[in-house]
Design a protein with these regions (language model features):
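A cross-family phosphate/adenosyl-ligand binding-site feature
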Residues: 1-182
């Protein structure tokens, strides 16, 4: 197993445009981060015309989600899933790991790697960015809100309800790692 200072942060993007620009801003400010893209995330990045400056990017191109083996190698100290679609959150809650992002979450849990999840559907009414800079009103379903609440009870998982909470959770985690490695 590697030492904490050599470990990296794994960031997984799903197919949501909700606060995607802001998530990319955070990603672009971080050091030692690897980016994992679901198939839908790769499409959404192109559709929205967003760019990132991450050097190591893994895409969902294999049936067995080969990149998850990096968690077994002790390569990561933290997994961030942001933004996380209601579909991704539902699969996490149900223990379904049938794509790259849900597999990463499952393997992070099995290897005791802390996860931070920014769920898109956190309030009964939201404004969200759609392609071409359109803002739309979104009304998450009761099941989406319930799944987000259930995810909050999972071990080694922090659920952020907004961008401030996401940024704070990441900074708190990095500070904790820095203290524990000193």
């Amino acid at each position: 197993m590697r030492h904490t200072e050599e470990k990296r942060l794994a960031w997984a993007l799903t197919g949501s445009g909700h606060y995607l620009r802001e998530c990319l801003d955070i990603i672009n400010q971080l050091q030692d981060v690897d980016l994992f893209l679901s198939k839908a995330a790769a499409e959404i990045l192109q559709q929205y015309g967003y760019r990132h400056s991450v050097g190591r990017v893994f895409q969902d191109k294999t049936a067995s989600s080969v990149p998850v083996e990096l968690f077994y190698a002790g390569r990561y100290h933290t997994l961030v899933v942001a933004p996380a679609t209601s579909n991704t959150v539902a699969k996490m809650v149900a223990g379904i790991s049938d794509n790259l992002v849900t597999n990463l979450y499952a393997q992070a849990g099995k290897t005791r790697v802390a996860s931070i999840v920014f769920a898109c559907d956190t309030e009964p009414e939201l404004e969200s960015e759609a392609p071409r800079d359109n803002i739309v009103k979104v009304y998450p379903r009761r099941i989406d809100l319930e799944n987000m609440e259930k995810l909050k009870t999972f071990e080694e998982t922090t659920v952020a309800g907004d961008m401030l909470q996401l940024h704070s959770a990441i900074q708190d985690r990095l500070a904790c790692l820095k203290i524990s490695s000193s």
